[in-house]
From Swiss-Prot:
SMART domains in the record: ANK
Protein name, UniProt field: Putative ankyrin repeat protein R600
Keywords, sorted A to Z: ANK repeat, Repeat
Species name: Acanthamoeba polyphaga mimivirus
Cystine connections: none
PROSITE patterns in UniProt: ANK_REP_REGION, ANK_REPEAT
ANK repeats: 79-108, 118-152, 153-182, 184-211, 212-240
Amino acid sequence: MHRVRKTNYFYFDNTRLDLADEDFEYFKQLLIDNNIDELCQEMCNKNKVDCFISYLVVIDDLDNFILITDRTDTYIHSNECRYFRMAVYNNSYDIAKYLLENGANVHVCNSYAITCASGFGKFYVFHSEKKEKRDTVELVKLLIDYNAMVGTDTCNLVHTAIDANRLDVVKILVENGADIFSNQSKLLKSAVMYNYDILEYLISQGIDVTDDNNSVLKFAVSRGYDCVDLLLDAGADMNTLRREDVSKAILMKGSEIIETLNNNGYDFECLNGFSNTIIDTHTSKIINILNNRVSMTDVASILLYNSKYDDNYRK
């Protein structure tokens, strides 16, 4: 009977790092027993030095990281500062800080570190063994202190933070000089999708909601996002809305959006003549049959009640 070898996996740079359970547990016990010489020898014999050091990075065990890299003469900045990038990827703050203090290139791999850190969720979960969580804001601040934003596309960093729903990171980036004006419509659309508070913050910082011919208002209306009132208050021009934008809001039963437009004086008469633009023969045939036989109010009620317009269109 063959014993199945369970394996601990963790991934980085599309490379799977693994330690078979018996090796993994053996190495850990040697570490616990402070039998460092034997540990280093066994890791070398099994060609697992890099793998075990990587594991220490993942769990942010700085003391043993320093000890093992020193005893095994491991160069800590090899492979484009791989351990540093791994530390950032796993939010291993202590090791990331140590590596920066000892010469890690904060801009390595096209500013990987600050881009990665800006895109973390509210909390990034460590390796399951430690069952630990830490807010990632401190890591972002650390990287900024080491000039990670210098020479970087900071507008893209803000966009990354918005996509991660991180108002706190957006604020830190902006407070440290991040650009929010070179691609305003992109940032606004992302904020519309992910976080009303971020949208409100960007507006408070002077971002122009009319950028790109009010494209963010068209985006919000046509996809049913409940921030139209905020955009209008900030100066968005609803007269730029197309017939298609409003019709999509109607089909999605966006009653709040339609009500907001109505309260702000939007002229829904632009929808008159919409039937003349329909080129689908099946739709035209139905309209012709129903015309003068069924009230348009009832036709609209039937269509809206039975509308299966993609509720997941907002993505």
